[in-house]
Amino acid sequence: DLKKFPGKRGLKKEAKVNLEFALMADGVAAGDVYKVLATKEGVDRAFKKLETIKSSVVWWEAGAQPPQLLASGEVTMTTAYNGRLFTPAVTENKPFVIIWDGQQQVFDNWAIVKGTKNKDLALDFVAFSTSTKPLADQATYIPYGPARKSSAPFVGKFEDGKTDMAPHMPTNPDNMKNAIVQDVKFWADKYDELNERFVAWIGK
């Protein structure tokens, strides 16, 4: 809404995430986004919505760029990795506020190479790194995850010893009311096709 909230918008230079945001901005419920995006009409609808702000978009490619764009005043709002905004807001008192409504959650994964000589050691590491306490401890440094529900009660304070991390977690129930989890299967099947169209659209 450029009229209600004037100013430039920062968006990642990629189809993934932006098409989902566009459909939600156009009134599609979070739970229906991928069902709609799986149709030609849905894709067209997403691009049509993006077109309404295209002239006001500043495209970013690296995760470090959104906080820089905000701090410099080049954009009024931007999509971003939440951890990239949290740290400068807390440690440098930057006036950044995260809008959780419509957030998209993306998961990272561990993989073990088939045939590795260290299979047992690798399995031990994956088991440890995805267990309850280590995932909660990770949140001491950056507010990502934890992906395991059992970790939530153990999330403590930021490394400054003062800032409670729980309210800053994407997985905090208060932050998940209108969230969607990125559909990795959808993007595995459609990424090349949709991103090619996206790149061509940017260049028009």
Task: Set out the residue ranges of the language-model regions.
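Extracytoplasmic ligand-binding site segments that recognize negatively charged/polar headgroups
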Residues: D1-Q65, A71
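Sec-exported extracytoplasmic/periplasmic mature domains
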Residues: L2-F5, L23-V28, E51-S55, A71, ...
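Solvent-exposed loop/turn segments at secondary-structure junctions
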Residues: A15-L19, G83-T87, Q103-Q105, K117, ...
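Periplasmic-binding protein-like
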Residues: V43-D44, K48-T52, T91-T116, F158-G161
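Short, hydrophobic alpha-helical packing/hinge segments within bilobed ligand-binding/sensory domains
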Residues: P66-L69, L85, A122, L135
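Conserved C-terminal helix/tail region of periplasmic/extracytoplasmic solute-binding proteins
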Residues: Q68, D174-K204
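A ligand-binding cleft/hinge motif common to bilobed small-molecule-binding domains
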Residues: M77-K94
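Mature extracytoplasmic/periplasmic domains
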Residues: V113-N178
